[in-house]
C-alpha cells in the first residue's frame, strides 16, 4: 500500500531491531517508507518479516493480561504455547533462537513513525512454551498505545476450490500451518473492510493497469 493517505491511517514502521532471533544475533533494519525486500535466498528477508509478526503476536497476547504496570522494575510475563504461536511455524521453540541456543531471551524492537518504540522479549521456558513481555524501557503509557496489525503470508502452494468463512483464530492457525492458499479469500475480505482497500486498488491500477 502506498501514499500519504495510507500512512495517516496506519502505523508505519521506521526501524526494526532483532536480537538472538533465528539467523541474526543482532541486526537493525531501517525502513524509510514503502519498501520491497529483495535479495538472494537465505539472507534474512523472511526472518525479518517473521520477527515483525512475532512482535505483534507477543504484544497482543501480553495486552490480554490487562496489567500495564511494572512490578519490581519489569512487566508481568504472558505465556504463549507453541500451537498458538501463529507468527512462525515451529516444531519446537528452540528453532527461534539464534543457533538454537535456547536460553535467555529474544528481543524484537520496533520503532514507529508515530514516535513510540517498544521492544518485546520472548523468554525461553520449554520447547512447547515461551513467555513474552515488553522491555521495561518503554513506559506504561507507550506500551498501552503501541499497536501494529500485521499478517505474514508465507509462499502459497495452491488455492482451495472452496473456502468457508473462518474466524480470525482459524485464519491464524492455517497461516501457522503454512496454508495461506486455504484462507486467501478470507484475507481479502478482511482487507476489503479497511480504508486502505481503495488505496490498494488505486496502486494496482497505477502499477499494473488492472
Language-model features, listed with the residues they occupy:
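Low-complexity, highly charged intrinsically disordered N-terminal segments
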Residues: 178-194
